[in-house]
Structure formats: C-alpha cells, structure tokens
Amino acid sequence: DSQGKMMPALAKSVDVTDNGIQYNFTIRDDVFWSDGKSITADDLVQFFREILTEENEDDIEALMNVYGARSYLNNEGNFKETVAIWAEGNNLIIRLNSIDDDFLVQLSKPQYRLRKNVLSWEFINNNYTSLVYSGDYYISSMDENQIILHRNEKSNTDIPKVLSIIEDKSEDIALAAFEVGNRDIVVNPPRNQLQRLKEEGKLITLPSNKAVYASFNLDECAIPINGRKKVYSLLDSA
C-alpha cells in the first residue's frame, strides 16, 4: 500500500512452515483473470513453470532458491517431478532450498505478476487485446502516448471504471496539465515542486529501489479514495 506494507492480492493467507523454507498460499476464491475466468492454484504453478523456463535467471532470482529449480534448468528432470512448486486443491505450495526472509517481498515485484503466455508479452503493442492476466483492469487501447485501462466486470465497483495513462513530453508539461485539472495523478513531478506539493498535501512517496513520487489532484471530481488506494498498488508494482 502507500505505506509500503505488504498487502494480500491473490492469496487470502500464507503459512510458512518447516523452519521457514516451505510456503503455503491459500488462493482466494474471488480472484479472476482478465477474461473473467477464475484463477486457480494450478494456474499459478503453470505460470511459475513458464517464467522459470523463459525468463533470465537474473530477473527471477527468488525462484533460483526454489528446491529443484536449477536442476530443472540443467535438464535434470521435468518441472512436475523436479521443481518444488505444486498445487493441492486451491493451495499453492513452494519449497525453498534455504530460508529467504525476503521471498514474499521479491514475489511482489512486477516480473511475478500473474499472466498467461509469458512470451507473448514481448509483443504487447500488437497483441494486447488477446493477452490474459490478473488484476482489476484490462488494456482496452494503447498507442505510443497513452494506455486506456478498463475495470474488469468482476472487480470492485468502488474503484474507477477507466484509467488513462498518458506519457507527457516533460515533467513540466505533466504538472501544468495537473494544475489545471487535466490530470488526476502525476508520477515524478519536477523536483523543484516537491516541497510545495507536499505542503499542499498532494504528494506521496512510494518505497522502491529508486524514489518514486506521485502527486494527486484533490478535487472532489477526481479519483475517490478507494480508487487512489488501487492506484497506489498499481504504481508500487510498476
């Protein structure tokens, strides 16, 4: 969230057992793919198999500590019989080689966002309409300067129905549009304006590997509080 606290997304609970090396995620029954189908623990197993197979090791370091992961990548067995990631009913279980206190934090990073057909995302500009992924929004249109997100039918109706992500030519242009009410949120406004925005109660700072600032328009017609909370999580995972 906006305070940097870990919040549940797909799982309603996580139990850590066996001296800290086994994680049991109980998957919620109210989480859905962007096409409206329910997300299951088996879906997550398939996703982890895909990214372990297709992604660079440096990008998925957390999975390199999963029991059997390196053996699988060295062609020493198939995924199901070698890698300690499996489903039991609607529970996803992951067993590590050794304790990793940062494991859950690592899994919250963007590269672990649940999606189908991982390789297809390399060509997102051409096939975004056919991509399937988790989350409250789906991409309805996109071009070089703008992405339009629409709320999924089964998502919470308290969050905004449509989000427009616009790439302005400069920080100053973005802030100017914000000041006249044409932007609800500006990410990384000009540094010389940070103190003023903070004093006006319009600035939040998100924890990250590098500093990320966001300025929120406080107009009553702008994004409501529940919508802001959702945007916090989207920005934090970007």
Q: What spans do the regions from the language model cover?
A:
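Aromatic- and charge-enriched surface segment that lines or borders ligand/interaction sites
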Residues: S13-A62
